[in-house]
């Protein structure tokens, strides 16, 4: 699998660039840009490999002797390394613009090895720098560029932009009985729009989204003139598939979740996003319907959902009121799902290496 890389400029991006001569040639000129260390640590944790690429005009000549460049550069590297920041390579072009070399940014000679097939994931790699030449380099490499600005797109914002996930999936399911559109955003909250034609079922699905801490839009056209069976079943299948797709490779998720009490009922839920579908369910109801939802379809919903989502799900509730018992199951599932889909790191939560 190709790797995601960050190609990062030095002067004006990692360290401050002196406005007078644009050369960091003394120790007293060395100053890190604000928040660069925590940002680079966060980016490393998100599995980015770091490459420093910098133009150093006339390095090694009388205008910029190597012996004046090395002390501040080496100190910068010592500071970064001491904080756990590791650069795969330090790429330096020492030439002047008039030298017409092939390695000066925005030309790509220094990064040719990364442009070979299968080395770099171009969709998830970036050039980060404070100059237009950095953005031109990104364009020449076929990747995206980010223009660093201390008072604009700063390191805190860059780290947030590149590490914050927006897990989304869309599923369209059409059968002879139903037509269903499901959108799921696991990293957004609020604003869910749900219309299945079964009012109480809409309310229950909203409980999953609200207590699960994510957003979903569900639009259903079903054969309700017969009953609610196909509408509930197919919605569960489409929703489970959408959640499963949105989870992606499941890297970094909590995977497990469990909750006990809910309302005056005692509702229990244990969840493992394991890739192995299974449902254990125990609930009894006094009546055949709650509102316009058949109570027998509650178990069928969760069974269909668990199989489409490829998860192991244990659900149980006790109580006196059917409305509360049904609602407790949807609420407790939502709260449990919130724990399981939360991103807690960047490793796959399985000793098998796959979920």
Curated annotation (Swiss-Prot):
Catalysed transformations (reactions): D-erythro-1-(imidazol-4-yl)glycerol 3-phosphate = 3-(imidazol-4-yl)-2-oxopropyl phosphate + H2O; L-histidinol phosphate + H2O = L-histidinol + phosphate
Location of region: Histidinol-phosphatase: 1-166
Binding site for Mg(2+): 9, 11, 130
Entry cofactors: Mg(2+); Zn(2+)
List of catalytic residues: 9, 11
Keywords in alphabetical order: Amino-acid biosynthesis, Cytoplasm, Histidine biosynthesis, Hydrolase, Lyase, Magnesium, Metal-binding, Multifunctional enzyme, Zinc
Disulfide topology: none
Keyword field contains Metal-binding: yes
Subcellular location(s) of the protein: Cytoplasm
Sequence segments annotated as region (Imidazoleglycerol-phosphate dehydratase): 167-355
Pfam families xref list: Hydrolase_like, IGPD
Gene Ontology molecular function: any one: metal ion binding
GO CC terms in record: cytoplasm
Transmembrane helix as UniProt keyword: no
The EC number(s) this enzyme carries: 3.1.3.15, 4.2.1.19
UniProt family annotation: In the N-terminal section; belongs to the histidinol-phosphatase family. In the C-terminal section; belongs to the imidazoleglycerol-phosphate dehydratase family.
Cross-referenced NCBIfam families: HAD-SF-IIIA, hisB_Nterm, Histidinol-ppas, PRK00951.2-1, PRK05446.1
Protein name: Histidine biosynthesis bifunctional protein HisB
Taxonomy of the source species: Bacteria, Pseudomonadati, Pseudomonadota, Gammaproteobacteria, Enterobacterales
Gene coding for it: hisB
């Amino acid at each position: 699998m190709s790797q995601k890389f960050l190609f990062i400029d030095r002067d004006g991006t990692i360290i401050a660039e002196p406005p007078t001569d644009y050369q960091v040639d003394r120790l007293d000129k060395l100053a890190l840009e604000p928040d660069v260390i925590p940002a680079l640590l966060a980016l490393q944790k998100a599995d980015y490999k770091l490459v420093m690429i910098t133009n150093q005009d006339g390095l090694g000549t009388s205008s910029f002797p190597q012996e004046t460049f090395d002390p501040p550069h080496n100190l910068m590297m010592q500071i970064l390394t001491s904080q756990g920041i590791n650069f795969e390579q330090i790429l330096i072009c020492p030439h002047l613009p008039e030298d017409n070399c092939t390695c000066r940014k925005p030309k790509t000679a220094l990064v040719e090895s990364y442009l070979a097939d299968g080395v770099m994931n171009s969709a998830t790699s970036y050039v980060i720098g404070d100059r237009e030449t950095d953005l031109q380099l990104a364009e020449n490499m076929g990747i995206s560029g980010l223009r660093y600005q201390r008072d604009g797109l700063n390191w805190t914002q860059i780290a947030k932009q590149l590490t914050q996930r927006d897990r989304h999936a869309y599923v369209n399911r059409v059968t002879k009985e139903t037509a269903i559109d499901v959108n799921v955003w696991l990293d957004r909250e609020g604003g869910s729009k749900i219309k299945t034609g079964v009012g109480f079922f809409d309310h229950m699905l909203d409980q999953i989204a609200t207590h699960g801490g994510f957003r979903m839009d569900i639009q259903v056209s079903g054969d309700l003139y017969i009953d609610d069976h196909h509408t509930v079943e197919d919605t569960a299948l489409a929703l489970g598939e959408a959640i499963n797709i949105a989870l992606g490779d499941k890297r970094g998720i909590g995977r497990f979740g469990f909750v006990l009490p809910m309302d005056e009922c005692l509702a229990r839920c244990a969840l493992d996003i394991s890739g192995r579908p299974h449902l254990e369910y125990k609930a009894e109801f006094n009546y055949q319907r709650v509102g316009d939802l058949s109570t027998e379809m509650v178990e069928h919903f969760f069974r269909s959902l668990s199989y489409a989502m490829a998860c192991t799900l244990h659900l149980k509730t006790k109580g006196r009121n059917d409305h509360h018992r049904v609602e407790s199951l949807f609420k407790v599932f939502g709260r449990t799902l919130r724990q399981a889909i939360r991103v807690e790191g960047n490793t796959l939560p399985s000793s098998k290496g796959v979920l």
